[in-house]
Amino acid sequence: YFGTAFYGFNASVQITASHNPAEYNGMKVSRENALPVGYDTGLGQIKEWIESGRECPVAQKRGEVRQIDVRKDYLPFLLKYKGDWSGLKIAMDVSNGMASLFVRDIFGDTPSWY
């Protein structure tokens, strides 16, 4: 969601993993400013289109593929919310989540923080 809003994309699709079997994996769809796309704001129309069997029109203009390292912009965004946590004991399990990419950058190397 961050990248969609920060870079001004018109829409985004995230492929989501699941702890359930593979057939339950899915997609998170958002539009400009990372606003969610739900059943009433577009997903219902997509469902109807697919179920109708109509062909999808071909875009008049080809898109482009860009590789962007979102981390360089996302970390400063996260750090804006870091307060004075001295006196707090924080337990965190980032397991296989994306937060694991930023834990050391935010909390440092002090083992008591993990």
Where is each model-derived feature located?
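Ferredoxin-reductase
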Residues: 1-33
